[in-house]
Amino acid sequence: MKFTNGYWLNREEYDVNSPKETYDAQQNGKTITAFAPYTRIMSRGDQLNLGTTTITLTSPVENVIGVKLEHFDTNEHGPEFKINNLDPEVAIEVNDQVASLQSGDLKVTLPLRTDFEMKFTANGQLVTQSETKPQATIWNHDTKVNYMREQLSMGIDEKIYGLGERFTNFVKNGQVVDTWNQDGGTGSEQAYKNIPFYISSNGYGVFVDESQRVSFEIGSENVDRVQFSTEGQSLQYYVIYGPTPKEVLHRYTQLTGAIKLPPAWSFGLWLTTSFTTDYSEETVLKFIDGMQEHHIPLDVFHFDCFWQKGFEWCTLEWDKEQFPDPEGLLKKIHDRGIKVCVWLNPYIAQKSPLFKEAKDKGYLLTRENGDIWQWDLWQAGNGFVDFTNPAAVKWYQDKLKVLLDMGVDSFKTDFGERIPAEDVKFFDGSNPQQEHNYYTLQYNRAVYEVIQQEKGADEAVLFARSQRLVHNPIQYTGAATISRSTAQCVIQLRGGLSFLLSGFGFWSHDIGGFEDGPGTPTADLYKRWSQFGLLSSHSRYHGSDVYRVPWNFDDEAVENTRKYVNKLSLMPYIYTEAAHAAAAYGNPLMRPMFLEFGDDDNVYDNATQYMFGSKILVAPIFNDQGKAHFYLPSGKWTSILDGKVYQAPRTGEWVNEVFDELDLPVLVRQNSIIVRNEKAVDAAYDYTKDVDIHLYQIQDGNVSSKVVDEHGQDTAEIKVERANGRIVINTVGLTGDSTVYVHENNDTIKLSLVDGKAEVTL
């Protein structure tokens, strides 16, 4: 949101007041409260007839400094995010010249009785700063609305990322971003998952702790600053110092909540009915059995909207005309070793039998005059469940318990973005502008909690479309994806990478695209999209009016899917990375290149490839000629598919190569241990039994890798030492017969473990 007319002038409708100095400051325990008037105070008379901003400085997590800017001390109506306070040690100095607070390496300094500035430094180096004009309280005298604004400096060549699942350019510099959840598809500037957090290439991040709309101008109003503003009389934000991007994300998730580890089975293949297709018990079993007949392992089957009767979403009851015996059907699916997911949304159509019940009990949002808030968008006479009402939450959860007891394992929590923010009342009196974004958190939490209660914490998982802050185990995108264009794959990927830089660990999308058209997707596109989707953290075939089973395209599509579903063989590596990097440390499983190679300037703009965990590089091919253009940081890289070795020089290297239709670059970085089980037919199995240990281009020194079990607990460890051309392998915790494969240059040496040990001289 822009307030200025060029650099010199403010827009006519705005009155802008900025702190001109920090007049004084006080320490209260581990907090500093400073007072910043809107003019320099040269005499006692200057203290009259002017406003001040109260600046409160805190540190809830080491290397994180919280800043609250407050003009008027107004009542807060909520809702508000829950922020963790780990109560770190801080160093505070307050005297007649300066006020400063230091947490870990990060320090904020406010000089007193001189031109206003607020500097954030680490180890004596500037991180970012707010100066005399950027910070402001702004009054729109036309609309009678007040705003609070902050502007933090950007360095030369500094790049900004994150802000949720955004499908615009990966680097956000020059963009205007409003964090307001909307159902805008994946081809617009709107986003389902708006997260008011950005991460900088300069080793820090900023989280704006406001649930309502926050407007970001990333070098787009003042070109050397990131500006963020919101309605109201106060603004809370946190500066988070790394110095590495991984450490920034770790501290951010310490602040806002840890990433939860999804159950192992969720990492397998999900297949859906698609949306408006015809589906019945016969159709469902035909597709499930078809996957088995084509030797394609399937872990989850998803029923989309029409498991319920049309015009009645949601009834949370099966359409008995299509599914006369749902319990029997779920048992048949479970007997085939497959989990079940069903679709739901937080709305209740007027035709639904639940509508009157919810209306009579006061469980739906109302207008200011007491009428139910309804519209005809999506379902006729849609009402909205009021998740601020504890009784409504329990009522909704009780309906879901029936389904869980019946055999449903998971839910796809669709929608939750188009929540009214005008002429609406919430049960708990929440501010509608704040509730618009916060609603999806309450909706997802209600569903997630009931799964935890019924299935256990280790089995709880959601496929959630919209989001604000809470760390549900899976997020997905895909609505309104245009499947005709290979460019949509790139758009999906950069949206996913932006989202995964916003504090989330796992992500998926609709393989093949959701929106259909004549002749789409082509078999070529389907195969390339399948490779990308099956090498994502979570993998789901889904569409609108076309079934996404591979045999509907061609025989090669079946072969391609079968090949890349073999991601299951990598589950010892994948689940260990998920448990250690994501759940324990706050880093995503799929990650942009700069998270792993922060010292390489060539990777900071790259959003067409990614690291799958810390050791495997994936470069999807987004054209029908098989042309790959990918970047390799310095070192040796080995193809996990055919063993080809690439040697990238010290400065890194761009590679142009043509791959056949069933191949793409999937490369392991040097000095890596990858544990696999080629016999895997499910995602959840014993990751320590009868495994293959692949050692890729081991360098002199020591390297080790832990292996978790299917519950995410450390169970085994592999240690490797190389010296004088000799490699020694020691393992603890493995069972059965395991084999070691030493990949040395272009050769592969096979070894057997004896008493958990092996060695070879090269």
From Swiss-Prot:
Pfam families: Gal_mutarotas_2, Glyco_hydro_31_2nd, Glyco_hydro_31_3rd. It comes from Lactiplantibacillus pentosus. The keyword Membrane applies. Involved in the metabolism of isoprimeverose. Hydrolyzes isoprimeverose into equimolar amounts of glucose and xylose. In vitro, can also use p-nitrophenyl-alpha-D-xylopyranoside (alpha-p-NPX). It catalyses: Hydrolysis of terminal, non-reducing alpha-D-xylose residues with release of alpha-D-xylose. InterPro entries: Alpha-glycosidase_related (IPR050985), Gal_mutarotase_sf_dom (IPR011013), Glyco_hydro_31_C (IPR048395), Glyco_hydro_31_N_dom (IPR025887), Glyco_hydro_31_TIM (IPR000322), Glyco_hydro_b (IPR013780), Glycoside_hydrolase_SF (IPR017853). GO terms for molecular function: alpha-D-xyloside xylohydrolase; carbohydrate binding. The active site is at 414 (nucleophile), 417. It is found in: Cell membrane. This is Alpha-xylosidase XylQ. CDD domains: GH31_N, GH31_xylosidase_YicI.
